[in-house]
Amino acid sequence: DSRQFEGLPQSLRDVFKRSLLILRTQIDNRGAIIAANDSDIVRFGKDTYSYMWGRDGAFVVAALAKAGYSHICTKYFNFCADILAEEGYLFQHYNPDGSLASNWHAWLVDGKEILPIQEDSTALTLWALWIYYQSLNDVEFIRPLYNNLIKKAADFLVSYRDTQTLLPLPSYDLWEERYAV
């Protein structure tokens, strides 16, 4: 859309278009937005970063919504609705096919069972859906997501709080090193 580029120098237009192309190479056609399609760590780590993290996907899809790429956004949100746990949260990360990915988060901390999640992934998915709505005003797409994504995730986020402080309960941090608030 030429409106996106009004008044911008050609060098910025080129960077914008190149950025969109690079983003698209990391997006599975079923909706998963992959952190990185690389194999650098396979040799030593026996794993890749070819996973969908809800946080990363939310930031990417928010930018794509602002750029007007609704078709990619809708696939991502449908993907999230499909993988959302029955209780309303996203796990740490998923394979592009929607299956739960290998996980290095413990399910037990100090002998107590915990959810191996990064709570912000669930919250940021709802935030990105709000950005999508603000950018594209596509309420017809959002309406069917109300019960199986929006309400379930919001109910989880409201319930996943300390009853005394009302702060969120602990979850794993951005770098997956600490389990805390």
Language-model region placement:
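Aromatic-rich carbohydrate-recognition surfaces in CAZymes
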Residues: Y49-R161
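C-terminal ends of transmembrane alpha-helices
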Residues: N29-I33, F156-L169
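Short loop/turn segments at secondary-structure transitions that flank enzyme active sites
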Residues: T25, N29, E86, P96, ...
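Acidic/polar, glycine-enriched structural segments that form the non-catalytic walls/loops
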Residues: D1-Y49, S70, A81-E86, V139-F141
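Residues in flexible loops and secondary-structure boundaries
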Residues: R24, G31, I41-V42, G98, ...
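Active-site-adjacent structural elements in folded domains
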Residues: A36-T48, D110-K112, L167-V181
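Short clusters of hydrophobic/aromatic residues that line enzyme substrate/ligand-binding pockets
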Residues: I33-I34, L90, L100, P168
